[in-house]
Curated annotation (Swiss-Prot):
Keyword Amino-acid biosynthesis applies: no
UniProt enzyme class: hydrolase
Protein name: Acylphosphatase
Taxonomic source organism: Cupriavidus necator (strain ATCC 17699 / DSM 428 / KCTC 22496 / NCIMB 10442 / H16 / Stanier 337)
SUPFAM superfamilies with a match to the protein in the record: Acylphosphatase/BLUF domain-like
Family: Belongs to the acylphosphatase family.
Gene3D superfamilies: 3.30.70.100
């Protein structure tokens, strides 16, 4: 199957609630490659590489997030790169 890379940005109460770690676990469960990081503007940014079906599943998870999160929006757009494994990146 053809793979794509998407950039997803979660808005709302998504920092300090375990969102990044839970998102990385969800991405691992979906066998996606890529990374996740906090941004100084209070969002969480994800670059994910996989099939459209896998990416749509991650987007659906991100729209809900872990129980303590309150997600108001998940922006989705094209991303760059191909990744093996999923990692944490430093905050920017």
């Amino acid at each position: 199957m053809k793979k794509e890379t998407w950039r997803l940005v979660a808005h709302g109460r998504v920092q300090g609630v375990g969102y990044r770690a839970a998102c990385a676990d969800a991405a691992d469960d979906l066998e996606l490659g890529g990374w996740v990081r906090n941004r100084l503007d209070g969002t969480v940014e994800v670059m994910a590489h996989g099939t459209v079906r896998q990416l749509e599943a991650l987007q659906a998870w991100m729209e809900q997030g872990p129980p303590a999160a309150q997600v108001t929006l998940v922006e989705v757009g094209p991303g760059e790169g191909e990744f093996a494994g999923f990692e944490f990146r430093p905050t920017i």
